[in-house]
């Protein structure tokens, strides 16, 4: 995937159902080698710990409470944040994961089933008490827009190589910006030149591309935090797979933060 996670198809063994009669019957089809048993191991709070790691590394405000707590094996990021923001754990988890995955305010509001006024009050309280999540996200968005890439925990490039126009119109009917085409760099440059030719009646300076970044920007930078989190988590899990293999243990399947042996 774009973040470095593994994906599967035909069949997708990462999404075998586990609940209900059918799910249980499907899982009974998978048998360990003779004389062996299945073992399933996953990371504890892998993605939230990555967020805290980078927030601490950058010295962002609001991380003092987390520094010691997050080294504990049984750390519960969502409960820690709930206590910091003085909200329920359910609300804290919804907001945390929403921000981690680049969810907008309106979608978060709908997920929480709140009115706009109550949602705004909740978000204000959250960001006042837990400022490092939004600050980290904003810093990463700015970095991604400037450099067109991020580096994951293992220094792997996570590129932003699609482009979109900065000129977006707000649609009051759907209460969001109008969708815009997502383009390759070549197509974005072609579109930019066509816009200039139309605007200036074919009288375009030879150095017109110097203004390209004023009108176009890398697409999906609002997901920069998600790219960093999932990309770094993928690095950690893949490294664990290699380490296990070198010790003579063969992972049978990887499901994001979980390894089945």
Predicted regions and their residues:
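Catalytic palm subdomain of template-directed nucleic-acid polymerases
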Residues: 51, 104-117, 127-131, 259-261
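Generic structural marker for isolated residues within well-ordered, non-membrane alpha-helices
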Residues: 78-82, 94, 105, 123
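Residue-level signal for cytosolic alpha-helical hairpin/rod architecture
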Residues: 92-93, 105, 222, 256
